[in-house]
Amino acid sequence: MAHAEAIGELRALLGDRVSTNDTVREHHSHDESFHLPVMPDAVVFAESTDDVVTVVRVCNAHRVPLVPFGAGTSLEANSNPIHGGISLDMSRMDKVLRISGEDLDVTVQPGVRRKQLNEVLAGHGMFFPVDPGADATIGGMASTGASGTTTVKYGAMKQLVMALQV
C-alpha cells in the first residue's frame, strides 16, 4: 500500500515524469549483469535537483525503496531495484554546466554520459580519463567508484571527483 501511496504522491507532484508503463519499468529492471530482472513499481524521470529531493523525501516518508538509474551499464546490478520501489532515472539531467580550462575542472549533471562529456571537453583541449569500457553516466561512475584502462596513469573516480552535490 505504501508503494501505491508514494506513486500517487509523486504523480501529483511531478506529473507525467512518473511512469508505471510496463515497457518503461522493464527497461529499468536490469542492467548488463547476469542478475535476473526485478521490476520497479514505478520510474521517475528527474529533470532537476529539486526533482531528486522531492523523490527522496516522498520515498523516505513512505519507506519505499529508491534506486538511482543512469545508463544501466553496470555489470554488478547496482541499478537493479531488487526490492521493487522507485527507479529514479537521471538521464534527463544530462547537461555540462561549467568548464574551466584554467582550473582543468568541469561541473556536470549526473546523467551526462562519458562519451558526451569527452566530446564537449575536446573543444577545450581537455578530456575525462576514466574509461570503464561502457558509455556510463558520470553519476553512475561516481556512485560505483569507476575505474578502467586509464586508471594507473590518471586515477579512478575517487581521485578525480572534487565535490558532489547530494
Outline where the language-model segments fall.
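N-terminal accessory segments
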Residues: 1-32, 61-64
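Beta-strand-loop-alpha "switch" segments that mediate conformational coupling across diverse proteins
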Residues: 140
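Glycine-rich loop at the start of a catalytic domain that most often binds anionic cofactors/ligands
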Residues: 31-37, 58, 78-88
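N-terminal glycine-rich flavin-associated loop
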Residues: 10, 35-66, 90-132, 146-166
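Broad gene-expression machinery/nucleic-acid interaction feature
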Residues: 85, 137, 161-163
